[in-house]
Amino acid sequence: MKHILLSCVESRIEHNRSFYSRFQLGPFDLGQGLTVGNAFRRTLLSELSGVGITLIEIDGVCHEYSTLPGVRESVLDILLNLKQLVLTSDTTFTVPQVGYLNFTGPGVVTAKDLKLPVSVYCVDPDQPIATLSADATLNFKFLVCQGKNYIIQTPVDKFHEYQKKILNSKLNLPLSSRTTLNSTFERPNQDSLVGTPLQEGVGKTKQNKRLNAHFQRQLKQLNRLKETSFKAYKTKVGEKTISDEFQTNSVNHQNLTTFDLREKKLTDVTTSLQHGEEATLLKEEGLNKLDNSSPQLENKLKGGRDFSGGSQLASQALPVDTLFMPIKKVNYMIDIDPAEPDRESVVLEIWTNGSIHPRQAVHEAAKQLIHLFSPFLQTHLVPTTLQSTPYSKAASKTQEFSLNETSTEKVKDELGKVAFGSENNTAALNQQKNLVTAIQTLDIANLNFSLRTFTFLKKENINTVSELVEFWTRQKTEAKDSIQSNVQSSVLLEISNNLKNFGVLPTS
């Protein structure tokens, strides 16, 4: 049989966060390639560990839907950029590590500006995080953890506390598009012209849209008032007066219709002119209010304070759904060499995120598979050390317990004959009683019997260790009484050796 080899056929670096390699594994017997390829693929995608950011606390940010003054990206975009960072570590750590960032604009914040923990570094230092304008600052700290697969965090308690705080504070919207929740303010007995509470990030375009919508609502209200007053006037004067006047002047129906149409057109023109003048006045009044409040608002926004009390809201830790998997994609294909039709090989394609080399990923996957299947390997029972008990050495050699005596009283009688060298006799008694009970119900498949002996015992309907001890005792009694038995001496010897190694029978 040829040696099974792992050879790299092709490898390339597509970019800093994408490594590709194609390996050939084999040769294998027909049918083994599918088992190996599928096992490697599933292990590579699920069992390899990685490093990622799991928790972020940004200075002055209470939730991920807010914005920061002087920062182009919203907090949600910053969280997504940090989630996409590819981190790696030379060592394995179980305790979360702390990193931080202190950056003052103008400039673009990249991964190389992060102050990462020891032995943790970023694969792509030029990966962007945020863009800051002049006099803008971005300060935050984060946790770096190591894990497998991915985690989805649902901090229900934190969000519930945040919502209660918002409802109790009754905060309105800021007017600037570059503010955080710290710059929100109260406007008592006034309606906000920009937005509704719990909204942020309203830009200049949205401000204009909101103002236009507000003016349209005001115009609709004026239209309703004019229509109501006009109907009341017609009701008070009466329509019969107009019709009688036309009838007395001998005006026909066609002239009356023409007069109504002209009157309607004249009314529409007059109303539109009035509405236009009122809309212009309202718009100028609103813009004057915005211009007058701009300096005061700008000072408040720069200071990061609210108008209600001047106190800054506390920052909240924002969880991140982290993806720890260093493997992006795995494909495998079974290849049969025409020169050797009875042999096959596996072609394995691996794409990584740059935090691990594809060849190292194959080695780690093989280790994980070995670790996964190692508990199912054949185990060899080590001779027990039941003689090293708190009892005296002389008594422990001569003492033998009968496993088919299951009553507690008999176990106490047997143990009472032993000279204890320990003061805690009750604990030793309970431990020995539990051990005897566990051994009694143990299946004989846990003993190292040969296939022939195991088959013989099963045919004799011997399934547990207690039944095996009873069978061995009966065979020993028959041998003393010179009764011929159909059990071979080799089988009895194997049973005796296994029971001695298991600690059920004395070794001498």
UniProtKB/Swiss-Prot annotation:
Keywords of the record: Chloroplast, DNA-directed RNA polymerase, Nucleotidyltransferase, Plastid, Transcription, Transferase
Alpha N-terminal domain (alpha-NTD): annotated span: 1-380
Name of a matching Pfam family: RNA_pol_A_CTD
Transmembrane annotation, as ranges: none
GO MF, one example: DNA binding
Recorded catalytic activity of this chain's protein: RNA(n) + a ribonucleoside 5'-triphosphate = RNA(n+1) + diphosphate
EC id: 2.7.7.6
UniProt-listed Gene3D superfamilies: 5' to 3' exonuclease, C-terminal subdomain, DNA-directed RNA polymerase, insert domain, RNA polymerase, RBP11-like subunit
Domain of life of the native organism: Eukaryota
UniProt subcellular location: Plastid, Chloroplast
InterPro entries hit by this protein: DNA-dir_RNA_pol_insert, DNA-dir_RNA_pol_RpoA/D/Rpb3, RBP11-like, RNAP_asu_C, RNApol_insert_sf
Biological processes annotated in GO: DNA-templated transcription
Chain positions covered by the region annotation Alpha C-terminal domain (alpha-CTD): 434-508
SMART domains listed in its UniProt record: RPOLD
GO cellular component: chloroplast; DNA-directed RNA polymerase complex; mitochondrion
UniProt subunit comment: In plastids the minimal PEP RNA polymerase catalytic core is composed of four subunits: alpha, beta, beta', and beta''. When a (nuclear-encoded) sigma factor is associated with the core the holoenzyme is formed, which can initiate transcription.
Primary role: DNA-dependent RNA polymerase catalyzes the transcription of DNA into RNA using the four ribonucleoside triphosphates as substrates.
Family named by the database record: Belongs to the RNA polymerase alpha chain family.
Entry remark concerning the domains of this protein: The N-terminal domain is essential for RNAP assembly and basal transcription, whereas the C-terminal domain is involved in interaction with transcriptional regulators and with upstream promoter elements.
Protein name stated in the entry: DNA-directed RNA polymerase subunit alpha
Organism: Oltmannsiellopsis viridis
